[in-house]
From Swiss-Prot:
Protein name (record): CCA-adding enzyme
Pfam families per UniProt: CAA_C (PF21133), NTP_transf_2 (PF01909), tRNA_NucTransf2 (PF09249)
Entry similarity comment: Belongs to the tRNA nucleotidyltransferase/poly(A) polymerase family. Archaeal CCA-adding enzyme subfamily.
Coiled-coil regions listed: none
Residues the entry annotates as binding CTP: 52, 55, 139, 159, 168
Keyword Transmembrane: no
Molecular function per GO: ATP binding; CCA tRNA nucleotidyltransferase activity; magnesium ion binding; tRNA binding
Quaternary organization: Homodimer.
Length: 415
């Protein structure tokens, strides 16, 4: 048995649900299907369970089930379906919450499981979907016909691998690999190991995966054409960083296999400088919040650099309940009061404006080094907190050198 096979033998144990878990998922899914069918009696619709819970590609401990209401009559609005279902579940005492994607859907809470009940329209292969959810029945059919039992096990293994390295999930928080994309990769390449072998050779903007002879053009680091919709790139959410992280992890696992790629150990925090800007969590959907604070983080990153602070890395973290924070790992949190500022070459027409500007200010210079003019001038901000406060309004807290999260730790899975 090879070293890779020995590690996978142990890793398979981590992704194999117990018979009790499988029984419970099937039981809860069947019960909710019956409830929904009863609530929508007389409506031209098919009610079924799709997604990973229906294909046995879910990870142990996962508490999510997807039930779809596939509407055959396009005059029926998803909003009306949701309203009918909400009244029914109020009547039988099942707790629920209203969620939104392109249209509303319900999340039920049944015996510790979160069951999403999603209306969609019935479409034929190749037909343009009305909503993104309309593709789900076709996705289920495509994968159910192609994935063997061993491949379904390998899908679970690949999901855990991606989750452990931090790139599992297509939501804005992660910008990584969706569950559907993970299943397509195993279906396309054949096995977990074959996916990693192929990914080791992927190159951004030059990797194009299609089950057909599709010639549709996409501009993205990774392209995986949806086999049921050739105009859609299933990998559109995968960022350059997430793709590159997966390529590195694939190469290193094949070179030096370890269970750490499936169960990362705890890594100690190092004493590097870090500043954390902490905001109260707003009452909005996670995708909206993550998108907003990633944009704010990028803007603040540029501002900090303009202030003279060297940023090693940065990121956004949140518990999606009480706080969202932007963290910057920096070289220094305090800068010296003066900085060398480079001007134009003395042979450039802009030199006169540079000299006249700094003759009116308190500086050292202007002086010439080589062909350029320079001055030594006072910084506007020397403290990183002052620089941040100049950019932002109120409603946040600044914590300096109190952060101990993943951005200041050794990568725990890498071997």
């Amino acid at each position: 048995m090879s070293e890779v096979e020995e590690v996978l033998k142990e890793a398979y144990k981590l992704v194999t649900p117990t018979p009790e878990e499988e029984r419970k998922v099937a039981e809860v899914g069947s019960r909710v299907r019956q409830w929904v069918s009863e609530a929508l009696a007389g409506v031209a619709a098919e009610v079924d369970m799709y997604g990973s819970s229906a294909r046995s590609t879910w990870l142990p401990g996962q508490r999510d089930i997807d039930i779809f209401v596939v509407l055959r009559d396009r005059s029926i609005k998803p909003e009306d379906v949701v309203q009918t279902l909400s009244r029914y579940f109020d009547g039988v005492g099942v707790p629920w919450s209203l969620r939104y994607a392109q249209h509303p859907y319900l999340s039920l809470y049944v015996e510790g499981y979160e069951v999403d009940v999603v209306p969609c329209y019935k479409i034929a292969p190749g037909e343009r979907p009305i909503t993104a959810a309309d593709r789900s029945p076709l996705h289920h059919k495509f994968l159910s016909e192609r994935l063997s039992e061993d491949q379904r096990r390998d899908v679970r293994l690949l999901k855990l691998f991606l989750k452990s390295i931090g790139v599992y999930g297509a939501e804005i928080k992660v910008e990584g690999f969706s569950g559907y994309l993970t299943e397509l990769l195993v279906a396309y390449y054949g096995s977990f190991v074959d996916v990693l072998k192929a990914a080791s050779g992927w190159r951004p903007y030059r990797t194009y995966i299609s089950f057909t002879e599709s010639k549709t053009k996409f501009k993205a680091p990774l392209v995986v054409v949806d086999p049921v919709d050739p105009n859609r790139n299933v990998a559109a959410a995968v960022s350059l960083t997430s793709m590159s992280t997966f390529v590195l992890a694939s190469r290193r696992f094949l070179k030096k296999p370890s269970l750490s790629y499936f169960s990362p150990p705890e890594a100690p925090a190092l004493g590097v400088n870090a500043v954390e800007v902490v905001f109260p969590y707003p009452g909005e959907s996670p995708d909206v919040v993550w998108g907003r604070y990633k944009r704010l983080g990028k803007s603040l990153y540029k501002h900090l650099r303009e202030c003279g602070f060297k940023i090693y890395r940065w990121g956004v973290e949140s518990d999606e309940k009480t706080y969202v924070s932007i963290i910057y790992v920096v070289e220094d949190v305090e800068l010296p009061p003066y900085v060398l500022h480079r001007g134009p070459p003395v042979y450039d027409n802009a030199i006169d404006a540079f000299v006249e500007k700094y003759l009116r200010e308190e500086v050292v210079g202007p002086f010439v080094l080589g062909t350029r003019a320079y001055v030594i001038k006072r910084r506007r901000y020397t403290n990183i907190g002052d620089c941040i406060r100049a950019k932002l309004g109120g409603g946040y807290a600044i914590r300096i050198n109190q952060y101990g999260g993943g951005l200041v730790r050794k990568t725990p899975w890498l071997t």
